[in-house]
């Protein structure tokens, strides 16, 4: 049986489109990642009509749904079994995510212990090798 979150509201994002960098469509050397314009005459910085929008605090998410996954849980990065036990009392609000650098042996231990503690993991099948019959 899967663990369900204690509270699962509808997550509303005020803006789903990415903020893109000014003139990144014009020059290939400029990446699309957002950079704040600093120029004295810059149209985007001065917020002229028809220009790219700048990110600001008004686009922030609801405080209760910030950092929430679509499942209704918040993510907690787990590197070993001991860190997993922190989630014992919070297993209806937080779910564990096994860190990238954890070996497959330790991953098995973490997955087993999570099942015992009834803690949900976001990536329980990641890098778990099954033995092939030869």
UniProtKB/Swiss-Prot annotation:
Top-level taxonomic group: Eukaryota
S-S bonds: none
Swiss-Prot/TrEMBL GO biological process terms: translation
UniProtKB keywords: Ribonucleoprotein, Ribosomal protein
InterPro entries from the UniProt entry: Ribosomal_eL32, Ribosomal_eL32_CS, Ribosomal_eL32_sf
Any GO CC annotation of this UniProt entry: cytosolic large ribosomal subunit
GO MF terms, alphabetically ordered: structural constituent of ribosome
SUPFAM superfamilies given in the database record: Ribosomal protein L32e (SSF52042)
One Pfam family, short name: Ribosomal_L32e
Similarity comment text for this entry: Belongs to the eukaryotic ribosomal protein eL32 family.
Protein name per the record: Large ribosomal subunit protein eL32
Source species taxonomy: Eukaryota, Metazoa, Ecdysozoa, Arthropoda, Hexapoda
